[in-house]
Curated annotation (Swiss-Prot):
The lineage of its organism: Bacteria, Pseudomonadati, Pseudomonadota, Alphaproteobacteria, Hyphomicrobiales. Its EC number is 7.3.2.5. Keywords: ATP-binding, Cell inner membrane, Cell membrane, Membrane, Molybdenum, Nucleotide-binding, Translocase, Transport. It is found in: Cell inner membrane. Belongs to the ABC transporter superfamily. Molybdate importer (TC 3.A.1.8) family. It comes from Mesorhizobium japonicum (strain LMG 29417 / CECT 9101 / MAFF 303099). This is Molybdenum import ATP-binding protein ModC. Residues 2-233 form the ABC transporter domain. The gene is modC.
């Protein structure tokens, strides 16, 4: 699964210059409003013709301005899901789904309708009209319609932006299933750190029409200096963990990560199941000696590998915990009082572990103190 983009385009006074390559299952285009995310995704879709450059999906050239190649949008085999579901109001859910297949030649169809219905959990909705659906249900149907076009690439332009938190919690698990159970590469537009940290395998961060960072999610999400101001407090470490064991005596689950063991309340998951967790920099304290007499359960030893200025009186400290970097945001006064320096051995005291319990028996975001 690969997507390669190297394009330039000007829209009035706004210019987009984007170059990135991703082989991840779900690539997030991330940045604040006005950073060029939607313009870029529209060029990939064929809705905007770039002034220069090339776009390739799975080795297939869609755009190459030097070679005079521009594949029209209806021949790109790209599925698209927008902020609003854009379902046909006079059609039932079943008819909306079938519409996705009408313009795909029979020999190019690979999507099975029953499998898509099962994947998205929309079987009970088939006889309804869009007016009788919730926002989350409409988006699931829109995703199903896009999948039934048998696309080679799925573009999702802020599909959760118009939903409240409850509806987001409803639909996120289905996007995760789509990412994990299909072989369709996904490009996902968002300005939410929580969404990107949960869903993305790779991130392309945009600002003022340019790519300012790209790479694996766990690396890019640590660039607190590049996050939108309103999202900076959500940045930090993203860790892919696995369930090691359950401590039934205390009702806890122990997760294994590169940074060390992390204890959280009991999860309804089997040993070995994957869990992605997020540790925000603002939720990490630093100790120069292993602390005692604390309620915090998650204390990770490490070495300081980075110290950089933050906003106002804050500094951001990167701690290498057995190969995984955990970030802490503390004050400069605290840094000086603790005499923190590069190479110093410290303990990261994690006050809160955040993750989404989509597959853990709940389905709502969870923040675990300690």
């Amino acid at each position: 699964m690969s997507v390669r983009v190297d394009i330039g385009h000007r829209l009035g006074d706004f210019a987009v210059e984007a170059r990135f390559e991703s082989a991840g299952r779900l690539t997030a285009l991330f940045g604040p409003s006005g950073s060029g995310k939607t313009t870029l995704i529209n060029m990939i879709a064929g809705l905007i013709r770039p002034d220069k450059g090339c776009i390739e999906v799975e080795g297939r050239v869609l755009v190459d301005t030097d070679a005079g190649i521009f594949v029209p949008k209806h021949r790109r085999r790209i599925g698209m899901v927008f902020q609003d579901a854009r379902l046909f109001p006079h059609m039932s859910v079943a008819s909306n789904l079938r519409y996705g297949r009408w313009f795909t030649p029979a020999k190019e169809r690979y999507a099975d309708m029953d499998a898509v219905i099962d994947l998205l959990g929309i079987g009970p909705l088939l006889g309804r009209r869009p007016a009788k659906l919730s926002g989350g249900e409409k988006q699931r149907v829109a995703i199903g319609r896009a999948l039934l076009a048998s696309p080679g690439l799925l573009l999702m332009d802020e599909p959760l932006a118009s939903l409240d938190e409850a509806r987001k919690a409803e639909i996120l698990p289905y996007i995760e299933r789509l990412r994990d159970e299909t072989k369709i590469p996904i490009v996902y537009v968002s300005h939410s750190v929580a969404e990107v940290a949960r869903l993305a395998s790779d991130v392309v961060m945009l600002a003022q029409g340019k790519v300012v960072a790209s790479g694996p999610t766990e690396a890019v999400m640590q660039r607190l200096d590049l996050l939108p101001a309103e999202e900076r407090g959500e940045g930090g470490a993203v860790l892919d963990t696995k369930v090691l064991r359950h401590d039934e005596a205390f009702g806890m689950t122990v997760l294994g990560s590169a940074a060390g063991e992390i204890r959280v309340p009991r999860l309804a998951m089997q040993t070995g199941a994957p869990v992605r967790v997020r540790i925000r920099a603002r939720d990490v304290m630093i100790a120069t000696e292993k602390p005692t007499g604390l309620s915090a359960l998650n204390i990770l030893p490490g070495t300081i590998v980075a110290i950089s200025p933050g906003e106002g009186p804050a500094v951001e400290v990167g701690i290498d915990c057995n190969g995984a970097t955990v970030l802490a945001r503390i004050t400069e006064q605290s840094r000086q009082a603790l005499e923190l320096r590069l190479g110093g051995n410290v303990f990261a005291v994690v006050k809160t572990v955040s993750f989404d319990r989509a597959n853990t028996g709940a389905g709502l975001p969870l923040e675990v103190d300690g």
